[in-house]
């Protein structure tokens, strides 16, 4: 059996920084209120002429440079996003052409909200295990600020824009040890964007093409669910909590991150945290955090990583990876 191993990472943040103090001038909120409840101090926003694909392209190029591989060797591109450039073609197809990749290689988007990158890893891993691909590019990219109601202080303080990417290579030794993916549509109304083009554009103004969230309920389910997936991931591989070197969580909220760390009995010094400077970037948050910790030297070859995410749907998932 063939396995997938990470050989390169990359990330990209747009230039504009929006601080909590900037938001104080827009809505009824405060820097203290935001920091205490979320851990966020600032987030990034795309320029008017930037798209999700632009962010994904920059992250992909940096990951490919780090991996030192040719574009022609990439067999598969998966983009996890809920803010694609177009309804169709997929952002992955657009990116395939923009990067100058081999025509005929496989490219598609995957929509699982904040779990999109972990879902992408899980799907890519199966392509490797069946021997269908030799090399893949998995990306999480989002322009969340484009779907925010800037008058809704419950959501507009949380989200930011960005992209992260990894290059996966075929290996005889497991890099991705296992992935665990789940969803539960019962919770569809707690977090999401209630409008979509399939409902007709005449309904857009009535429903609002913006994120809506019942924050307290989302928090309760997220903490409970992520606790279970920690146990599931470890049990599937015959591992103990002490075996995990690094937790690389979805950067939704510092309180959710801390709750997962407590479940693992892991000190926060072994948890990669970027939510303070980036906010919740949905599917982009995990690959960006991973890239940050690899480039600054915290994560080293041979380290055992637990990636976990939770998002609208609800969707949730984990990936246990030997880096």
Swiss-Prot record:
Q: Organism's domain of life?
A: Bacteria
GO function terms (MF aspect):
3-oxoacyl-[acyl-carrier-protein] synthase activity; beta-ketoacyl-acyl-carrier-protein synthase III activity
Q: Per the UniProt record, which EC number(s) apply here?
A: 2.3.1.180
Question: Catalytic center at which residues?
Answer: 114, 250, 280
Query: Which InterPro entries did the record assign?
Result: ACP_syn_III_C, ACP_syn_III_N, FabH, Thiolase-like
Q: Where is this region: ACP-binding?
A: 251-255
* Domain remark text: The last Arg residue of the ACP-binding site is essential for the weak association between ACP/AcpP and FabH.
> Which protein family is named in the record?
Belongs to the thiolase-like superfamily. FabH family.
The identity of this protein, by name, is Beta-ketoacyl-[acyl-carrier-protein] synthase III
Its gene name is: fabH
